[in-house]
Amino acid sequence: MKPAIVILCLFVASLYAADSDVPNDILEEQLYNSVVVADYDSAVEKSKHLYEEKKSEVITNVVNKLIRNNKMNCMEYAYQLWLQGSKDIVRDCFPVEFRLIFAENAIKLMYKRDGLALTLSNDVQGDDGRPAYGKDKTSPRVSWKLIALWENNKVYFKILNTERNQYLVLGVGTNWNGDHMAFGVNSVDSFRAQWYLQPAKYDNDVLFYIYNREYSKALTLSRTVEPSGHRMAWGYNGRVIGSPEHYAWGIKAF
């Protein structure tokens, strides 16, 4: 082997050796910063290298920190890993909810405050569609799946009720408080049918605030109980961040 090639090989090897000697807390900071500034390609490459070097705990610690700090970028980071051939990293280093989301598995959306599962009414309300509300989690009509869409360096979701084959949207009109009622519709070419998720941690639970793209309002269940006994679903015109126990949703396998 020519001396120049030997020197080059030794140099490359030294770079990897130096990287392997970097303390985990520094590696965590570097990866965390890549995610927070939305440099997802860099975050994916760092994650792949860490995973190959058997340092998956670095990725797990970063994911936990992102969730604790309510960083929406955590969703984009996970989606890009999933999209770029690193589903194993999402399965091994993220909470199970992320795999359920990006694999488009059938799920239940469980409102933390009431322990009720989101579903759609049997009745159709005019041109708006089927009203969405909270129901006992054992109902067969509480099955949903999230369908990811990538646009402008951000991941959005269509939320499909698998029983009705209808999409979750917010109505155009509002109540006296400025809230938009949620419905299930067959199809809609509007940001009203797109949503984005913000992860949160409450006790030992991983939860998600679910925001509508059109109105930037979080999906919640009403505090008022209807005569039918249901709590209707609304896009809430108020602050929700910091109170996941009141306004966030759990994602469970159906």
Curated annotation (Swiss-Prot):
The keyword Transport does not apply. It is found in: Secreted. InterPro entries: Lipoprotein_11, Lipoprotein_11_N. The keyword Isomerase does not apply. Residues 1-17 form the signal peptide. Pfam families: Lipoprotein_11 (PF03260). Keywords: Lipoprotein, Secreted, Signal. GO terms for cellular component: extracellular region. This lipoprotein belongs to the group of structurally related '30 kDa proteins' that comprise major protein components of the fifth (and last) instar larvae and of pupae. Belongs to the 30 kDa lipoprotein family. This is Low molecular mass lipoprotein PBMHPC-19. It comes from Bombyx mori.
